[in-house]
C-alpha cells in the first residue's frame, strides 16, 4: 500500500494551518539495543527541529510541540521494566529532554520477547494535548525484538492491573473506541511509525492498524533509522 495513502494524504487542503503536536517515543532499552540506542537518542533529539522544518515546507505551522519518552524492558527480568518521562515542551525544555535520554542505558531484558506492547498502551493512555484547532498524536516505536503477548506477565509482582489484556483491546484503544480505557488520545489525530523486526506482533499490526507505518528489519537488529523519512511521512499526512 502506498505509504502516504495509508497515512491519509489529502493533498493541500490544510495548508497554512496551525498544529499542536504531541510525540511519544517508545524505546526498547534492553541490552540487545546497545549497538543502536545512541542512534535512537540522536533521532529523538533532532526530531523536533526537523519536524518543524518539514511542516513549514508544506505550509503548516507547529504552534506547540511536546515529546514524551517511554523506555521499556521486561517485567519478568527487570526491576524497572517501564520508565516514563513527562511531556517536554520543545524547544523550551530541550535540556530536560536530553537529560532524560542521557539516563537511558541499554541493559537487562534477557532474551526476547520484551514488553513493548505495554509501552504502547501507556502511550495511548497518556495526557495528550486536546488544545488547538488541529492536532497530531504521534507514537514512534523502536525495538529489535518481538513482544510479549499482552497479559502474559500478569503474574509478575510489578505488572500493572490497568492495561489491556489482548491485541484486540489495544486496537480498540488505537481506534479510540475502547469501553474500558479513556484518555485525551484522538484516533483521527493518531499516527504510528514503528521500526521493528519482522516478527509477532508487528506483522499482525501491519495488516490491521490504520494510520500506521512499519519499517521492518531483519533478525539481527534495527537498521539505520531514516529520520527524514519519518518526518516526510508525518508532514505529508493531515488530520
Indicate where each model-derived feature is located:
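C-terminal "exit" segments of structured domains
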Residues: 15-16, 210-239
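…and closely analogous acidic/polar surface helices at protein-protein or active-site interfaces
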Residues: 20-21, 31-66
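Acidic, polar low-complexity linker/tail segments
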Residues: 1-24, 30-39
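Solvent-exposed loop/turn segments at secondary-structure junctions
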Residues: 29-33, 74-77, 109, 144-149, ...
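Surface-exposed acidic, glycine-flexible loop patches that form ligand/cofactor-binding
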Residues: 4-18, 56-61, 123-137, 182-186
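DG-centered beta-turn motif at the end of beta-strands
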Residues: 27-28, 40, 69, 120, ...
Amino acid at each position: 500500500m502506498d505509504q502516504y495513502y495509508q497515512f491519509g494524504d489529502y493533498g493541500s487542503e490544510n495548508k497554512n494551518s496551525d498544529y499542536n503536536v504531541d510525540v511519544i517515543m517508545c524505546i526498547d532499552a534492553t541490552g540487545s539495543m546497545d549497538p543502536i540506542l545512541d542512534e535512537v537518542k540522536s533521532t529523538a533529539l533532532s526530531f523536533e527541529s526537523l519536524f518543524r522544518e518539514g511542516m513549514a515546507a508544506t505550509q503548516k505551522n507547529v504552534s506547540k510541540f511536546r515529546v514524551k519518552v517511554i523506555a521499556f524492558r521486561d517485567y519478568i527480568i527487570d526491576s524497572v521494566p517501564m520508565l516514563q518521562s513527562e511531556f517536554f515542551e520543545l524547544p523550551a525544555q530541550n535540556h530536560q529532554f536530553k537529560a532524560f535520554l542521557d539516563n537511558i542505558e541499554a541493559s537487562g531484558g534477557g532474551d526476547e520477547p520484551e514488553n513493548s506492547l505495554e509501552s504502547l498502551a501507556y502511550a495511548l493512555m497518556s495526557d495528550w494535548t486536546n488544545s488547538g484547532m488541529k492536532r497530531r498524536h504521534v507514537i514512534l516505536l523502536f525495538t529489535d525484538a518481538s513482544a510479549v503477548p499482552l497479559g502474559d506477565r500478569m503474574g509478575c509482582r510489578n505488572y500493572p492491573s490497568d492495561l489491556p489484556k489482548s491485541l484486540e483491546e489495544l486496537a480498540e484503544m488505537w481506534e479510540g473506541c475502547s469501553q474500558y480505557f479513556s484518555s485525551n488520545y484522538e484516533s483521527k489525530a493518531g499516527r504510528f511509525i514503528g521500526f521493528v523486526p519482522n516478527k509477532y506482533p508487528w506483522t499482525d499490526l501491519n495488516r490491521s492498524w490504520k494510520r500506521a507505518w512499519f519499517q521492518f528489519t531483519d533478525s539481527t537488529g534495527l537498521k539505520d533509522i531514516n529520520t527524514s523519512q519519518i518526518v516526510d511521512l508525518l508532514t505529508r499526512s493531515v488530520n
